[in-house]
């Protein structure tokens, strides 16, 4: 079973979301997602300043197996991207919940968080796959 940190929120598309002290949200892909994709070779990051809607594809993770879209779990403005992934995309594999984060978003509609899964619900989703 994949590691599913209790403090995070999750999307059905296997992104995770963590609220930061400054009110922004850090987004990445889950350990389960990176296990399915395999070794990362490139991450196509979104543009800082871009406005996205929940469910929009805004980044791409390319692995030795496949390229997979990464979706915005909430609507808002991209305020930062993880530039370290340009040189070290494998951070998504080795540290999916830490240094392997993909982007930060300033949510424009925090009520969208209610549609995300908590750790228990995400674990149940994984068991059903």
UniProtKB/Swiss-Prot annotation:
Cofactor(s), names only, from the UniProt record: (R)-lipoate
All copies of domain Lipoyl-binding, residue ranges: 24-106
Residues found modified as N6-lipoyllysine: 65
Note on cofactor: Binds 1 lipoyl cofactor covalently.
GO cellular component terms given for this protein: cytosol; glycine cleavage complex
Database matches in Pfam families: GCV_H
InterPro entries linked: 2-oxoA_DH_lipoyl-BS, Biotin_lipoyl, GCV_H, GCV_H/Fam206, GCV_H_sub, Single_hybrid_motif
Signal peptide boundaries: none
Purpose of the protein: The glycine cleavage system catalyzes the degradation of glycine. The H protein shuttles the methylamine group of glycine from the P protein to the T protein.
Family: Belongs to the GcvH family.
UniProt subunit comment: The glycine cleavage system is composed of four proteins: P, T, L and H.
Record-given protein name: Glycine cleavage system H protein
């Amino acid at each position: 079973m994949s590691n599913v940190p209790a403090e995070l929120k999750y999307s059905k598309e296997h992104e995770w979301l963590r609220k930061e002290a400054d009110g922004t949200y850090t987004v990445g892909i889950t350990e389960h997602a990176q296990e399915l994709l395999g070794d990362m070779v490139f991450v196509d990051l979104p543009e800082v300043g871009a406005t996205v809607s929940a469910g929009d594809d805004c980044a791409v993770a390319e692995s030795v197996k496949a390229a997979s879209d990464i979706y915005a779990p909430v609507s808002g403005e991209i305020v930062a991207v993880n530039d370290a992934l340009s040189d070290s995309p494998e951070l998504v594999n080795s540290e999916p919940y830490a240094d392997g984060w993909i982007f930060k978003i300033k949510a424009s509609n925090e009520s969208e968080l209610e549609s995300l899964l908590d750790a228990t619900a995400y674990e149940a989703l994984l068991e059903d796959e």
